[in-house]
Amino acid sequence: MTGRLRAPTGRYGGKTAAERQAERRRRFLDAALQLFGDAPGYRATTVAALSEAAGLSTRQFYEEFRTLEDVLAALHLEVNDWATAAVVAAVADADHLPLAERAAAIFRAYAANVTSDPRRVRITFVEIIGVSARLEEQRLARRAHWVDLVCAEANRAVARGEAARRDYRLAATGFIGSVNGLLHDWNAGWVDATLDEVVEELVRQLLGILRPAGWEPARG
């Protein structure tokens, strides 16, 4: 299959072609969240099974996507976008708080969003791994996005006199790896802790990066 089939145009059932297409795409993504994120998983799902779960035909699948990998790619981006929206809102809401409280609020928002549905965790940290060079590039790009966000918040803390002045990119990259690994393990039941305890541990790690031993805020 070299390309998507053309979807019908015109109004039908009170909906435009674009509205019907968006609805079909949503149904395929919702079905993929269930099949990829729960059982049987991305690698064991077929186009026919996904179409059946969505209540649509395989022909309609090929009107929206070329391959199942395209569906996984779209779903991975969507799950990350949901988490980003939660973090951006938390950053705005916590802007007036001291650094420790601000960091806790931001990471609590991220963790709550990602772990609110175990299927999201599996899409983000499990199913995306090792599929193809294209999806590995996408995964690394999304990780770089989170590194950029941590660096931006660290630099804001520096500007406020709340953190040491330094290049945070390497530390942020390592920290994001810790976040991903700890949340994955917690969700899998391998970590005997509450989500609040996980967030508190991550905040302690972040504060240790931002305020290394011996650092003191500049006296104005």
Region spans (language model):
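C-terminal peripheral helix-coil segments that are non-catalytic and often amphipathic
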Residues: 1-11, 112, 116, 148, ...
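Alpha-helical DNA-contacting segments of helix-turn-helix folds
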Residues: 20, 65, 69-82, 86, ...
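Helix-turn-helix
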Residues: 27, 35-70, 74
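Hydrophobic alpha-helical connector segments
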Residues: 74, 88-116, 175, 199
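Amphipathic alpha-helical packing segments from all-alpha helical-bundle domains
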Residues: 85, 133-159, 169-173, 181, ...
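Secondary-structure edge/capping motif, primarily at the C-terminal ends of alpha-helices
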Residues: 90-94, 124-128, 186-190
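Short, structured motif recognition centered on aromatic/hydrophobic residues
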Residues: 123, 179
